[in-house]
Each structure stands twice: as C-alpha cells, then as structure tokens.
C-alpha cells in the first residue's frame, strides 16, 4: 500500500473567506477547516491516501514561538511513522518563510516536507489555493523531493526554506529566492528540480527541540536614517538573550546605535534590510562584538540565533552556525 501523505492545516489566507468574491485584501484568514479546503481541490485522490490534522486556524501574523515548537514536534512525530511518506502543511503566507525555515532546522528526516498557502482567499475569483495545494501534494509525491529539506510551493515554483522570501504584498507570484533562485518547478503533476540547497538542514541539523517548551528571546531591531537613541537603548535595557540588528545596505549600523549595542552581554548579529545579498564580517565587528548573518534575512537570522543559543553561547561557535545553516 502507498504510504500516506500527512496533511496539516494551520490557517492563513488559503483558509480565508471574504465578504465577496472580489475581496482580495479585507477578508478574514483562518475560517475554513482543512477538510473544507480539500473539498475545493479536484484531482487529489490519485495522490492519496492521506491523514488529516487541523493544527490551528490562525492568521500567520499571529504565529508564536510556541506554535513553531508544537508544529515541529507534530511533524517529527508524523515523519517518524513508517506509513507516512511525506508532510504537506497549509499556512498563511505572511510568516510562511519563517515557519518553513524553523522546520528545516528542527525536523530530522529525509521525507518530503512541503509548505504551501495562497495569496487569495478561498472564495475569491481565481483563488490560487486549490492549485497550490494540489501541486504541493504532487511535490510531496515526487521521489526527488526526498532529502531536499523543507520546501515552499506556490504559483508553480519550488523554493528552499532557507532562501525563500515573500516579495510582494498581494501578487500570487510573491515567493522567490532572490539570491539563489527557485529550486525547481511543478509541471504536469511532477516536481522538476534544477538545483539544491548546499546548507545543512533536516536530517543533518544538530538542533533538537523535542524536549523544549520555550526558546531564548531574540529581538529584531531595524535601523534607518535619522535613528535616535531611544529605541536601541530601550531594547538593550530589556536584556534579551540575543539581538538581530537589521542594518542599512551591507548591514551598516549607525554610529549612535553601534555605541549602544556593541559589546553587550548578549550576542548581536548584523543583518541587512535590502532583501538580498551577503553581510560579511569586517574588522569593526571584532571591536563591537558583532556576528554577521551571512545571506540570511533578518527574520531567519533571528530563528537561527534562537536555536543556536540552545546549543552554545560561544560567539565563535554561534558565528559558525550562520556559515553552516
């Protein structure tokens, strides 16, 4: 018998409903259950059998660290079962890239894990949820998806969890990997791959959250022209476990902010607000005690630092995580 695909619903626009079929922005996310979403998707039966879990039904902007921990544990339990061949998760697009990266670092498996969603609610004209879910299932059923880590599937494209970003507020072609490009495409019911991530993930990851109930508190602070001292001073005063500084350009930190955030008792990572490119170490980082995010977005750098702090507080070892993952 064919192994089952485990379907997990978390909410989001794919489960949303608007006041009319032309309401593309004022709708309510997380209304429909997973069973109702599936009922709107023709052509899924040949790719079964399935299991179904309604994990949550929320807007993805409301996702919490506890949600990530609980979802990771659920996915791990599922992939550890011999009769499960892969996992498909429906999720809101606003924080999809973060959830996908968290699972990419914390679920230990070779089995396909696919995250999908939609940019238009279920009742909208030309809703993209049904085709995205069908193609996500097709990707999970494609043998070549095994070992690729967590992937995100929308609009016919396959992206790796590490590098994918939401790049448009409303367009259905919102997901891209600006620096490295898509891993592949979905065509005629099959995933076609043209590249793979070279960074460690899933089965090779050293991060294990199965016994954790919380994670270190890491704060993200965005820098901008004309930034005064008040916000960085307030953040430092809360004494977080870690800080991601989203700098300008090549992660550049304004001098006044640097004076406040350098050589703190907690690790501080420089990232960039540009959306693409590498933040590399410079001599001033050693003086300030800063780490660098490599090519991770600020929000993903936050996730990696949270997980890294569960393993070590050594700055050199933490920096190596950013080069490894």
Predicted regions and their residues:
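A glycine- and small-aliphatic-rich helix-loop capping segment at beta-alpha/alpha-beta transitions
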Residues: 21-31, 95, 101-113, 129-135, ...
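Short Gly/Thr/Asp-enriched flexible loops that form oxyanion-binding sites at enzyme active sites
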Residues: 89-111, 253-262
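C-terminal non-catalytic interaction/assembly regions of soluble proteins
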Residues: 250-325
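A short helix->loop->beta-strand "cap" motif at the edges of active sites that frequently abuts
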Residues: 84, 109-112, 264-268
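Short acidic, glycine-rich surface-loop motifs adjacent to enzyme active sites
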Residues: 81-96, 238-250
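ATP/NTP phosphate-donor binding region
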Residues: 1-77, 276, 312
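Accessory alpha-helical/coil subdomains and C-terminal extensions
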Residues: 2-4, 8-12, 20, 30-44, ...
């Amino acid at each position: 018998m064919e192994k089952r695909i485990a379907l997990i619903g978390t909410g989001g626009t794919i489960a949303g409903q608007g006041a009319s079929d032309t309401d593309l922005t004022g709708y309510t996310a997380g209304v429909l259950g997973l069973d109702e979403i599936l009922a709107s998707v023709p052509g899924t039966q040949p790719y079964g059998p399935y299991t179904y879990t309604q994990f949550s039904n929320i807007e993805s902007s409301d996702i919490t660290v506890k949600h990530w921990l609980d979802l990771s544990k659920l996915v791990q339990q599922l992939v550890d079962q011999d009769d499960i061949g892969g996992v498909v998760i429906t999720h809101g697009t606003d924080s999809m890239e973060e959830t996908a990266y968290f699972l990419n670092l914390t679920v230990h498996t070779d089995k396909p894990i696919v995250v999908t969603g939609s940019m238009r609610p279920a009742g909208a004209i030309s809703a993209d949820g049904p085709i995205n879910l069908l193609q996500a299932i097709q990707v999970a059923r494609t043998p070549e998806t095994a070992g690729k880590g967590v992937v995100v599937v929308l609009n016919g494209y396959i992206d790796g969890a590490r590098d994918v970003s939401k790049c448009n507020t409303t367009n259905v072609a919102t997901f891209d990997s600006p620096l490295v490009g898509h891993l592949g495409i979905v065509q005629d019911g099959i995933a076609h791959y043209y590249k793979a991530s070279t960074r460690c993930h899933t089965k090779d990851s050293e991060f294990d959250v199965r016994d954790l109930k919380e994670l270190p508190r890491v704060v993200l602070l965005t820098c901008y022209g004309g930034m005064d001292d008040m916000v960085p001073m307030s953040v430092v005063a809360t004494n977080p476990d870690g800080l991601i500084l989203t700098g300008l350009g090549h992660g550049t930190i304004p001098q006044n902010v640097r004076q406040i955030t350098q050589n703190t008792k907690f690790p501080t990572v420089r990232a960039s607000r540009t959306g693409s490119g590498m933040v590399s170490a410079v001599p001033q980082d050693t003086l300030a005690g800063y780490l660098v995010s490599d090519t991770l977005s600020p929000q993903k750098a936050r996730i990696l630092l949270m997980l890294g702090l569960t393993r070590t507080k050594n700055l050199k070892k933490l920096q190596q995580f950013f080069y490894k993952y």
